[in-house]
Amino acid sequence: MSMHYEDYMRQVVEPMRRELTERGFKELLTPEEVEQYMESAEGTTLVVINSVCGCAAGLARPAAVTSLAHDKHPDHLVTVFAGQEKEATAKMREYLAPNPPSSPSMALFKGKELVHFIPREEIEGAEPEALIRRLAMAYNEHCE
């Protein structure tokens, strides 16, 4: 790929990154960062597989952020960006097995155990409030 294209894509996705990072999500940019985080994870973690698609912009990111206002919420927030940090995303997807690759998607972990997963096909066409409720129910069940 040309350097011009890569620079352009970095500029395009920056606001999409900030939508999560400015609200407390830590970006995991390399496979090593993903592995280091996941292998030492304690408590609960919400993972957002970010994406440039419309359902990420209109549904997944806003639902993830809004869900954090719930009384119970995850201890930690992390994100990887599909299509941007491909190796980091591939590494995170290993922890999401047996679920097939899906972006955007949201996952709740308790320690290293995947306890709740929302794939793209359940995000597309959903009402934002329904996604927020679904996350809140998972938080009620798994978060302190």
UniProtKB/Swiss-Prot annotation:
Q: Which domain of life is it from?
A: Bacteria
Q: What is this protein called?
A: Bacilliredoxin BH1716
What intrachain disulfides are recorded? none
Q: Which NCBIfam families match?
A: YphP_YqiW
Give GO terms for biological process.
Answer: cell redox homeostasis
Tell me which species this is from. Answer: Halalkalibacterium halodurans (strain ATCC BAA-125 / DSM 18197 / FERM 7344 / JCM 9153 / C-125)
- Similarity annotation: Belongs to the bacilliredoxin family.
PANTHER family on file: BACILLIREDOXIN BRXA, UPF0403 PROTEIN YQIW-RELATED
**Listed InterPro entries:** BrxB/BrxA (IPR009474)
